[in-house]
Amino acid sequence: MRSPCPCNSGKLYADCCAPFISKDALPATPEQLMRSRYSAFVIQDGDYLIATWHPQAVAEAWRDEITAGFRTTRWRDLAVQECAAGQDSDSGYVTFLALFYDERQRRNGFIHERSRFVRLNERWYYVDGRHIVPGRNAPCPCGSGLKYKKCCEQ
């Protein structure tokens, strides 16, 4: 795939997330893992998503839900807003805004999250995330041009 990487890094997919998703390399940072997970959502690679969730999450149980989401969700954009170290070298956080179109509801949506990552045995895993909710009168992050209270909050 000689196209731009879906993660919006500015690199080609082959030089960015592809080596991680194809298991030819391991992400060296939480940001690389987060970007590659976003790309996996875009290209609908459930195996990679499940493999990069923290083992205690038992993500395999969500396979059907993940696959169903692939059928109805079209990912539109990713903006990494902040990368922060955790309390030690084996933890970190990435704050991002991901935009998507939900074909079931026929509307735009977003995920604004501060994701938590940990490194176990030299490998980074996604643990969980804290959703960031905009103020009611703030512009809706989905890109509609409406206030949040008149758009995605409903």
From Swiss-Prot:
Transmembrane segments: none annotated. SUPFAM superfamilies: NTF2-like (SSF54427), Sec-C motif (SSF103642). HAMAP family: UPF0225 (MF_00612). Belongs to the UPF0225 family. NCBIfam families: PRK01617.1, PRK01752.1. This is UPF0225 protein SG1365.
